[in-house]
């Protein structure tokens, strides 16, 4: 693929984003990734935004359908229809996740030439295995939970050694890893400890905040604090959803 073709694909991805056609955006950035050339920061973010929206729509649908399916007053037929529809959405969600994980393992992680990119992609790997864990059961769930935790931990270890505590990618990783502990592993203490440590470490080094990423970093710090408030409150309702990181 020529440089011109690649630039056209990136331009198409931007047009798709502006028109909120995220499936088109994801396919354009998938093609860019499959050239095998390391992505620029802009391209990396376009890929992440595209798939986050594509998978996010299915995650949201899955939650709604699951709650309808669990309503005891629904007739057996209604519950059956809801189950069949949920399974269809699950199939779509799994296909998207494995598509992303394939790109990460084949192209993105091996080509990552700096710690920032490596952490970004390992975090992404943790995220997409976490999305699989949300809908999996039994042994299949155990496998994807382990894969998610391994990817997050690898990213976490690199980020602690190579990145400032105020770096938005390191903060976003801590945010999502803590959500993994809270929601997937049912470990609120570990989730709070991780989120609090990340927040405190960033506060202690606020003077290292990069002007370019100031907004991103402070936003994620706010999300960490919001989750800590949510997780430590006794009056937490069942409907409350923890905040997840963006695409830094």
Curated annotation (Swiss-Prot):
This protein's UniProt keywords: Cytoplasm, Developmental protein, Differentiation, Endosome, Neurogenesis
One GO process term, biological-process aspect: positive regulation of Ras protein signal transduction
One GO cellular component, as annotated: plasma membrane
InterPro entries linked: 14-3-3, 14-3-3_CS, 14-3-3_dom_sf, 14-3-3_domain
Primary site of residence: cytoplasm
Localization: Cytoplasm; Early endosome
GO MF assignments: molecular sequestering activity; protein heterodimerization activity; protein homodimerization activity; transcription coactivator binding
Expression (tissue specificity): Predominantly expressed in the ventral nerve cord of the embryo, and in the neural tissues of the head. Also found in the region posterior to the morphogenetic furrow of the eye imaginal disk where cells differentiate as photoreceptors.
Function description: Required in Raf-dependent cell proliferation and photoreceptor differentiation during eye development. Acts upstream of Raf and downstream of Ras, and is essential for viability. Acts as a negative regulator of the slo calcium channel via its interaction with slo-binding protein slob. Inhibits yki activity by restricting its nuclear localization. Binds to and promotes the activity of phosphoinositide 3-kinase Pi3K68D which converts phosphatidylinositol to phosphatidylinositol-3-phosphate and promotes maturation of early endosomes.
Description of how the protein assembles with itself and partners: Homodimer; homodimerization is not essential for modulating the activity of Slo. Interacts with phosphorylated Slob; the interaction with Slob mediates an indirect interaction with Slo. Interacts with phosphorylated yki. Interacts with hemo; this represses 14-3-3zeta activity which prevents the 14-3-3zeta-mediated activation of phosphoinositide 3-kinase Pi3K68D.
Family the UniProt entry places it in: Belongs to the 14-3-3 family.
The protein's name: 14-3-3 protein zeta
Source organism of this protein record: Drosophila melanogaster
Lineage of producing organism: Eukaryota, Metazoa, Ecdysozoa, Arthropoda, Hexapoda
């Amino acid at each position: 693929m020529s440089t011109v073709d690649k630039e056209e694909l990136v331009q198409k991805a931007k047009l798709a984003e502006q028109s909120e056609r995220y499936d088109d955006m994801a396919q354009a950035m998938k093609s860019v990734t499959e050239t095998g050339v390391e992505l620029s920061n802009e391209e990396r973010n376009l890929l992440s935004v595209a798939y986050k929206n594509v998978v996010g729509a299915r995650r949201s649908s899955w939650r709604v359908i699951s709650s309808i399916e669990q309503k005891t007053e629904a007739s057996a037929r209604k519950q059956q229809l809801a189950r069949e529809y949920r399974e269809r959405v699950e199939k779509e969600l799994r296909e998207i996740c494995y598509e992303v994980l394939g790109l990460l393992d084949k192209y993105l992680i091996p080509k990552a030439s700096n710690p920032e990119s490596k952490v970004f992609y390992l975090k992404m790997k943790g995220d997409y295995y976490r999305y699989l864990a949300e809908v999996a059961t039994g042994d299949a769930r155990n496998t994807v939970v382990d894969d998610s935790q391994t990817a997050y931990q690898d990213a976490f270890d690199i980020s602690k050694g190579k990145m400032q505590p105020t770096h938005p990618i390191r903060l976003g990783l801590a945010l999502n890893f803590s959500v993994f502990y809270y929601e997937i592993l049912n470990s609120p203490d570990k989730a709070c400890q991780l989120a609090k440590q990340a927040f405190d470490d960033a506060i202690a080094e606020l003077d290292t905040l990069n002007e370019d990423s100031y907004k991103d970093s402070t936003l994620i710090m706010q999300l960490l604090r919001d989750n800590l408030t949510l997780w430590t409150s006794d009056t937490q309702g069942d409907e409350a959803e923890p905040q997840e990181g963006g695409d830094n």
